[in-house]
Amino acid sequence: AFAVLVCCLRATRLPELGRYLLAGSLVLVVCHVIAACLGLHTWWAYLRSTFWSGTGLGTIWYVIQDSSGGIIPGIGWITGTLTVGGLLGLAWLLMTVPRRPRIAQVACVALLILFITNKVYSPQWILFLVPLAALARPDLRDWAVLMVGECFYSLAVWAHLGGLSLPGGSDADVVYWASVVLRLACEMWFAWGVLDDIRRPWNDVVRVGYADDPTGGVLDYAPDPAPEPVEDSSAEVAR
């Protein structure tokens, strides 16, 4: 939703944005109503675990908490503030770059911001990232970096849960902590590559030739009012 919102605002596709938000909101409400009717207790437990639970596996917050042996106070407010701040910063960047970014690029970076800053990072969430990463930056090197981090973490998390990565007589699972840091570092590497393509669209391999946004739907070849260039002070003096 974030990617569609920002890209439609930049392309001034307001009628399409309104229809998308209306349809998406209706689908979300219907799905939650059905889930609540089928199992109210399970539905409420899911909401509680999403918004009011503590830190979860796969996050840097879990590493900090597990290594220090304490509980991070106000973790929900901290992670929420970082996520909102990251998305606002991304929105500002998207409105100021020389060309409207592809919707897959925006969705991929927004998802990575959520994953990196969130207090919960379920293993299955990678299924959301894989197709977006392939569409956002089809670069073999960066894809390999991302997958190495994910594969190493997948092995480490099951070893952690089974107690197989703990040194003899120690409660400090350094191997698992390192896998979390490596995974997040690989994701930040990939996000930086996508952001570089957004900042310098002439280097985007998807836009070679006359392609614009092949998976963007109504945004493909949509009008793109470029931001006003900043006047150089030396040029102003020369005048």
Please tell me what each predicted stretch does.
Residues 145-239:
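Aromatic-enriched
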Residues 2-26:
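Perimembrane helix-loop-helix junctions
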